[in-house]
């Protein structure tokens, strides 16, 4: 039977037998009331979730053999805020990373007497299982200047480890953050000065607040994709993206190309609003790339969006275009979804 005689049937067969189409169906939301989600698939076969809890008072971890099981997995509080001083308020955006033979948690924290005077901090654990052992405070991760700093992530490329994070630029306004990158010389410190990669400039990045924050990195197809989130944390929140060649000097701002439009934004059609603060993981076999992010399933919020608990952890497969660029599409509706959407 030739393709000309059965185009629809044959194309359907190709689609259903592709790696993306056979990815395990995901059911959204994965976990309710968990914002800023970061999921890592470790070599032990477990997915680990670190995310912001609505109380902003602790760091929780949970693990499961599948993404869908994270919602019913036991959550363990591995660290709690201090009563006063540094690390005593606004515990935000924890990220779990295995570096060498230890686990590290990078997180944001303020002070009880100045809750929005946030900085970056690090915890360390030598146990094989990060839900066990002892998490040791390793102090503030210094960025080179003191100002509002949050949302640290780390990645390695060609033997070099990098830190990316958001911070108010020197001389920047109170409600402005930009995304920076620097090389790391240890898991606890950066080496040399930081490079500013993106600051708010487009209208969709400056709704209510001038915000670029929450960088996340995916290396694929000879490129480094760095997503980030922009604007206020309500329905205006949206994802942007920077792209560089994986052979480029990542500390050269000119090596990066910035998308002029959001790569994911609110969708009335799917009923999901304010998607962002994402991370990346894969299917268990590593064949399907998966976007993990938070969103609300309603648009209008009463009061301060930061006090609203309903940013839910969600996930969906990533589609890849013929030119090697990711197509995140729109946030999918609540319920099951498995195939990448365009």
What residue spans do the PLM features occupy?
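Carbohydrate-active catalytic/glycan-binding domains of CAZyme proteins
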Residues: 6, 22-342
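Bacterial N-terminal signal peptides
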Residues: 7-18
